[in-house]
């Protein structure tokens, strides 16, 4: 069901969907229900807007399929807005601050506030990317900078000392950065050490495998292609399940800032 699965038009079965939306708390968005959004600057792309302030998030996530020569040459970002791009599949060419980046699967680009990024598909076949934007929260004496690389080059961290849960950190742990992007991977049977409750929000896109996720104390099956929004203080934890393939997702997290009152 849905454009990502190429099942649209006349139905041959009951209308059904695994999606769950609890505004400000959590949401599970599945490929079956996602629709295309027309966004100025995105040409020859299928773009879906995921988390937004309308859902209760302080950020915006996108899932974008770039067809041949598709991309955004107008510029993604803006004054006071930080952005992040991750290549799920394919090859793209991205530009920012006068530099050009050839990004393949696992490639990423972070642009600090005020720096626009452009990108275009670099192959005849479709490429798919995960995009993020958020209004930057400044702190006196510190500033972020442009960061690019590939997930394959990042240090593999044993999450909380567990050999079967691997964490990748995309951005420096510096006070200039008010957010980070990570990949968390669970071997089948592995899990978080405890159910978390914290002020940070997450937007998570599942890259591989299957899992069972606790969202506000509801245990919910999830799998590759699903998207999860977790609001501040929403209970959260997950298990990897299935046979062989790791349960992995890329996710954002706000950090390094006090709470304004």
Swiss-Prot record:
Cofactors: Mn(2+)
Family annotation (Pfam families): Cupin_2, Cupin_3
GO BP terms: purine nucleobase metabolic process
EC numbers on record: 3.5.3.26
Residues the record lists as binding Mn(2+): 196, 198, 202, 236
Main location: cytoplasm
Induction profile: By glyoxylate and allantoin under anaerobic conditions.
The entry's keywords: Cytoplasm, Hydrolase, Manganese, Metal-binding, Purine metabolism
Cited function: Involved in the anaerobic nitrogen utilization via the assimilation of allantoin. Catalyzes the second stereospecific hydrolysis reaction (deamination) of the allantoin degradation pathway, producing S-ureidoglycolate and ammonia from S-ureidoglycine.
Protein name: (S)-ureidoglycine aminohydrolase
Organism in which the protein naturally occurs: Escherichia coli (strain K12)
């Amino acid at each position: 069901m849905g454009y990502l699965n190429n099942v649209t038009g006349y139905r041959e079965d009951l209308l059904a969907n695994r999606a769950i939306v609890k505004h400000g708390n959590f949401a599970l968005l599945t490929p079956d229900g996602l629709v295309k959004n027309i966004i100025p600057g995105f040409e020859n792309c299928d773009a879906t807007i995921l988390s937004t302030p309308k859902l209760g998030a302080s950020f915006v996530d996108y899932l974008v399929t770039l067809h041949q020569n598709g991309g955004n040459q107008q510029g993604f970002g803006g004054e006071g807005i930080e952005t992040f791009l991750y290549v799920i599949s394919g090859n793209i060419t991205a530009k920012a601050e006068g530099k050009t980046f050839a990004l393949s699967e696992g490639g990423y680009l972070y642009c600090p506030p005020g720096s626009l990024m452009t990108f275009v598909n670099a192959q005849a076949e479709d490429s798919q990317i995960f995009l993020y934007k958020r209004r930057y929260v400044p702190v006196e004496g510190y500033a972020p900078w442009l960061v690019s690389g590939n997930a394959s080059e990042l240090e593999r961290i044993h999450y909380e000392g567990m050999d079967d849960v691997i964490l990748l950190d995309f951005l420096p742990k510096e006070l200039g950065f008010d957010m980070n992007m990570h990949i968390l991977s669970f071997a089948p049977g592995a899990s978080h050490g405890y159910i978390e409750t914290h002020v940070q929000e997450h937007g998570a896109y599942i890259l591989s495998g299957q899992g069972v996720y606790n969202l506000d104390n509801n245990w919910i099956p999830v799998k590759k292609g699903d998207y999860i929004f977790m609001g501040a203080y929403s209970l959260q934890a997950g298990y990897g399940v299935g046979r062989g393939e790791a349960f992995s997702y890329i996710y954002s997290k706000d950090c390094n800032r006090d709470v304004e009152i």
